[in-house]
A protein has these predicted regions:
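C-terminal transmembrane-helix exit sites in multi-pass transporters
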Residues: 34, 88-113, 225, 239-260
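Specific transmembrane alpha-helical segments of multi-pass solute transporters/efflux pumps
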Residues: 1-3, 38-85, 121, 207-225
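Glycine-/small-residue-enriched transmembrane alpha-helix faces in small-molecule transporters
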Residues: 1-24, 59, 117, 128-158, ...
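Juxtamembrane helix-entry segments on the extracytoplasmic side of multipass membrane proteins
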Residues: 12-20, 46-51, 124-148, 187-205, ...
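Transmembrane alpha-helices of multi-pass small-molecule transport proteins
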Residues: 11-64, 89-95, 147-155, 170-189, ...
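Helix-helix packing/entry segments at the starts of transmembrane helices
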Residues: 18-21, 80-87, 156-177, 211-248
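Hydrophobic transmembrane alpha-helices of multi-pass small-molecule transport proteins
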Residues: 30, 104-126, 241, 257-276
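Hydrophobic/aromatic residues within transmembrane alpha-helices
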Residues: 9, 18, 22, 72, ...
Length: 279
C-alpha cells in the first residue's frame, strides 16, 4: 500500500512539497496525541541535551529521510523502489549491530550480499553481464534511505530508553524541528503543494497513516523487542499485495527482473530470520 500511495501522491506534488504537506499532517497528529495524553508537559522536565537530541534527530528523520525516499520513488518505477526498500529488514539489524558493537557472522554477511544481489538484478533490469544500470540515482537514493531510516530509528530508540521518554513525545519533537525547515526549503525552492484534491488526499493519507500511526506502532514494537530481526520478519507479508496494487492502481507492468530481484532479496531476509531462530 505504501509504495502505491507514494507514487500516486507524487503525481500531484514534487518530493519536497509532498514531504512538507505530509509532515504537517503528522505533526498535527502527534501534537493532538501528546496534548491529550498530557505528556507534552514533561518536556520541561527533560534535560536540555535530550530535547536537543530529539530535535536534531528530526532533521534526519522525517526531513532528510523522506525527501530522499520520495525522490527515489519519483525517479524509479514504484515496483523497483518498493523492492529495494524491503532491504530495510537487512539494514536495520546491521545498523543495530554497530551500536551494540557486535560484528555480523560470515553467514549473515553472505545473506546480506545475497539480498544486495537482488538489488543488482533490479538495477540492471536483469542484465548482470553488462552491468548497465537503469536509473542509478534512484537506486542509490532508495538504498541510502534504508540506511538513514535504520540509523534514525536505532538512535531514537536508544534516546527514549535511556531517558524514559514517551515515544510519541519524542516523535512530536522530531517533527517539530523538521517542519519549519521543510516549509522554508519548500517556499524558497518554489515547490509549494499543488491546489488539488489529489494533493490534499495524498498528503493527508501519507501523513496520518504512513508517517503517523505507522510510526507509533513501529516505535512501540522497537521498544518491546530485544532483537530487530523479529520485527523485520513482518516484511514477508507485504510484497504480493504491494505488487498487486502497483499493477492495478498504478497500471505498471511488473517486470520479470523486479520479480526475480525481489525473490532474491526475500531469500536473503528469510535466511536472516532462520539464523535468528537457530540461535
Amino acid at each position: 500500500m505504501m509504495a502505491t500511495a507514494f507514487k500516486w501522491a507524487l503525481e500531484f506534488n514534487t518530493p519536497m512539497a509532498l514531504i512538507t504537506l505530509a509532515a504537517t499532517v503528522s505533526w498535527g497528529f502527534f501534537g493532538v496525541r501528546v496534548v491529550v495524553a498530557g505528556s507534552l508537559k514533561s518536556v520541561h522536565e527533560m534535560k536540555s541535551g535530550v530535547v536537543l537530541s530529539c530535535l536534531l534527530l528530526g532533521l534526519l528523520n522525517p526531513a532528510f529521510f523522506y525527501w530522499i525516499l520520495f525522490t527515489a520513488y519519483d525517479l524509479l518505477p514504484a515496483q523497483d523502489a518498493m523492492a529495494i526498500n524491503y532491504t530495510w529488514g537487512l539494514t536495520l539489524p546491521l545498523v543495530a549491530s554497530v551500536f551494540s558493537r557486535t560484528l555480523p557472522t560470515k553467514y549473515e554477511t553472505g545473506l546480506a550480499l545475497l539480498s544486495y544481489l537482488g538489488i543488482l538484478v533490479i538495477a540492471t533490469n536483469g542484465n548482470l553481464g553488462a552491468l548497465e544500470f537503469d536509473r542509478p540515482a534512484g537506486v542509490a537514493l532508495a538504498l541510502l534511505s534504508t540506511v538513514i531510516w535504520s540509523l534514525s530509528w536505532v538512535i531514537n530508540s536508544r534516546i527514549i530508553d535511556a531517558n524514559n521518554i514517551d515515544p510519541e513525545l519524542a516523535l512530536f519533537l522530531n517533527f517539530s524541528a523538521a517542519l519549519p525547515l521543510l516549509w522554508i526549503v519548500t517556499v524558497l525552492a518554489g515547490q509549494m503543494p499543488t491546489n488539488s484534491m489529489g494533493s490534499l488526499l495524498g498528503g493527508i493519507y501519507i501523513g496520518l497513516f504512513e508517517m503517523g500511526i505507522a510510526f507509533v506502532l513501529w516505535m512501540r514494537a522497537m521498544r518491546l523487542t530485544d532483537n530487530p530481526l523479529r520485527i523485520s520478519s513482518l516484511i514477508f507479508l507485504a510484497p504480493p499485495l504491494s505488487l498487486l496494487l502497483i499493477g492495478t492502481v498504478l497500471n505498471e507492468t511488473i517486470a520479470g527482473s523486479t520479480l526475480v530481484g525481489l525473490v532474491i532479496i526475500l531469500m536473503g531476509l528469510a535466511g536472516q530470520q532462520w539464523l535468528d531462530r537457530a540461535r
